[in-house]
């Protein structure tokens, strides 16, 4: 029994360890060896004057948003930092072929690279993931980050604009004499000169399109750190993005154009409809609502006025003038000979000369035609039916009082006046017949005055129609030219073909 137990113990001790157990033990021994005398606060420079080279790369995972109001860009990125720490090198042959280790970020020296133009005061990365250490002493750290960086917004051509936003990274604690920055390599090992985007994992933004994404290393003099005059190095990543204007075209610009068309057709609406002022004021209030909605989208700056605000203001000015001119048209339409006398130049310009050029033609007045009487002088009919028809029908006023025109009234015909007012003996008519003729003459004068009054009132209405049509064509020209001038200017505002021309 004792012999069996002894053989079992010897068998267990003689069995080789599993590969995983041996690997874990080897990594543990290697970590203990590397970090026994390691100080993470000491810069990994063999000499005091040596500089530690740190390469910085950036992988863009998502352009989350660009807040024009707060001038802030939100991005989801992966920062790629790589440097050499001579204290973390070993010979793989002496440690079971181990070529890389993964250790916590707090246990090694970090170059203290932060986003300088952050907008929320948070300089740290989103997650302190482990660093990868290779046997040559190369240390690589790829922490993810949700950054909110400041971005100066140029609002002149909003919403047909493009923006140049930057992300500035630098070592916060070391100057260029201690830490040397450079752009990191791309996946092919070449020196990277732009932000890397992985097509398979990148999430496209629905409002912005990335045009260029270069990077640049700059040197800034005059930086005092540690009580001495030094230089600071910064790696700047540029995002040159162009706005996709479809949202504003459909929801803002197209309704504004339709409202402008309503303001134009105000001048095509007849004044008797009674809705000219209501339609104009409705269009003005609608544009005011659009202006208030856009005020929350653009930055509060006095450096420039966005192009869409220019168009809204231009449209509001036109609609305001349409309200004023509608008042003028209504004033002309409701004038009468009792209140206003039409000047000669108004008659010549707006009645005789201007209408043909505006596509207006005044219809000719139609006079009542007296039908030819067909009387039968039979004993049955006699004179009764013919005289009844004659006095029932309205005679033309010019039949009794012929005039050259209605605007220069003349006295009745001299022969008729002598016929009416002449001495009874000369006329030789009975008194009853003379009274009938006098009554007919009075009614003819009243009818003529009413006809002249209506004709002059129709002249004012026709002048109002001509002025309305003149304003219609004027507004069409001004609206078309103004819209083209405002928006054609934006077509020349394109991103540069090269990021650094």
Curated annotation (Swiss-Prot):
Q: Does the keyword DNA repair apply?
A: no
Q: Which residues lie on this side of the membrane: Extracellular?
A: 24-244
Q: Please give the superkingdom of this protein's source.
A: Eukaryota
Gene Ontology BP terms = acetylcholine receptor signaling pathway; behavioral response to nicotine; chemical synaptic transmission; membrane depolarization; monoatomic cation transport; monoatomic ion transmembrane transport; muscle cell development; muscle contraction
Transmembrane regions listed in the UniProt entry: 245-269, 277-295, 311-332, 470-488
Subcellular location per the Swiss-Prot or TrEMBL entry: Postsynaptic cell membrane; Cell membrane
Q: Name one GO molecular function term.
A: acetylcholine-gated monoatomic cation-selective channel activity
Tell me the disulfide pairings in this chain.
151-165
Glycosylation (residues): 164
Which keywords fit this entry according to its UniProt record? Cell membrane, Disulfide bond, Glycoprotein, Ion channel, Ion transport, Ligand-gated ion channel, Membrane, Phosphoprotein, Postsynaptic cell membrane, Receptor, Signal, Synapse, Transmembrane, Transmembrane helix, Transport
Which residues point to the Cytoplasmic side? Answer: 333-469
This protein's assembly is summarised as: Pentamer of two alpha chains, and one each of the beta, delta, and gamma (in immature muscle) or epsilon (in mature muscle) chains. The muscle heteropentamer composed of alpha-1, beta-1, delta, epsilon subunits interacts with the alpha-conotoxin ImII.
Purpose of the protein: After binding acetylcholine, the AChR responds by an extensive change in conformation that affects all subunits and leads to opening of an ion-conducting channel across the plasma membrane.
Q: What is this protein called?
A: Acetylcholine receptor subunit beta
This protein's gene is called Chrnb1
């Amino acid at each position: 029994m004792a012999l069996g137990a002894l053989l079992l113990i010897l068998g267990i001790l003689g069995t080789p360890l599993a590969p995983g157990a041996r690997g874990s033990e080897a990594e543990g021994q290697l970590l203990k060896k590397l970090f026994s005398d390691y100080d993470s606060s000491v810069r990994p420079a063999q000499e005091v004057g040596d500089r530690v080279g740190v390469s910085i790369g950036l992988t863009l995972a998502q352009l989350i948003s660009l807040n024009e109001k707060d001038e802030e860009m939100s991005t989801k990125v992966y920062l790629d930092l790589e440097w050499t720490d001579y204290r973390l090198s070993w010979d793989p042959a002496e440690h079971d072929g181990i070529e890389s280790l993964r250790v916590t970020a707090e246990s090694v020296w970090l170059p203290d690279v932060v986003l300088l133009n952050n907008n929320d005061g948070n300089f740290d990365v989103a997650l302190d993931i482990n660093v990868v250490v290779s046997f040559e002493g190369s240390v690589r750290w790829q922490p993810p980050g949700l950054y909110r960086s400041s971005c100066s917004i140029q609002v002149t051509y909003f919403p047909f604009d493009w923006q140049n936003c930057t992300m500035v990274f630098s070592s916060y604690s070391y100057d260029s004499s201690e830490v040397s920055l450079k752009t990191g390599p791309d996946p092919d090992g070449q020196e990277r000169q732009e932000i890397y985007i992985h097509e398979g994992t990148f999430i496209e933004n629905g409002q912005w399109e990335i045009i260029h994404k270069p990077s640049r290393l700059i040197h800034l003099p005059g930086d005092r750190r540690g009580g001495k005059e030094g230089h600071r190095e910064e790696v700047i990543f540029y995002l040159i993005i162009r706005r996709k204007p479809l949202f504003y075209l459909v929801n803002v610009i197209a309704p504004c154009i339709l409202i402008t068309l309503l303001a134009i057709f105000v001048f095509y609406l007849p004044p008797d409809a009674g809705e000219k002022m209501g339609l104009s004021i409705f269009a003005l209030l609608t544009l005011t609502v659009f202006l208030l909605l856009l005020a929350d989208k653009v930055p509060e700056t006095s450096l420039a006025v966005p192009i869409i605000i220019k168009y809204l203001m231009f449209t509001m000015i036109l609609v305001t003038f349409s309200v004023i001119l509608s008042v003028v048209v209504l004033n002309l339409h409701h004038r009468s000979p009792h209140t206003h006398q039409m000047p000669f130049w108004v008659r010549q310009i707006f009645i005789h000369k201007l209408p043909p050029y505006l596509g207006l033609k005044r219809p000719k007045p139609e006079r009542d035609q007296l039908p030819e009487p067909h009387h039968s002088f039979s004993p049955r009919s006699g004179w009764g039916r013919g005289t009844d028809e004659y006095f029932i029908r309205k005679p033309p006023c010019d039949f009794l009082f012929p005039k050259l025109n209605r605007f220069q009234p003349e006295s009745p015909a001299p022969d008729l006046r002598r016929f009416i007012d002449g001495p009874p003996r000369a006329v030789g008519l009975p008194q009853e017949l003379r009274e009938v003729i006098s009554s007919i003459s009075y009614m003819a004068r009243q009818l003529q005055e009413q006809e002249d009054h209506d004709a002059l009132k129709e002249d004012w209405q026709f002048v109002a129609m001509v002025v309305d049509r003149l304003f219609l064509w004027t507004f069409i020209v001004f609206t078309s030219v103004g819209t083209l001038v405002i928006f054609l200017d934006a077509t020349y505002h394109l991103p540069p073909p090269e990021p650094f021309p």
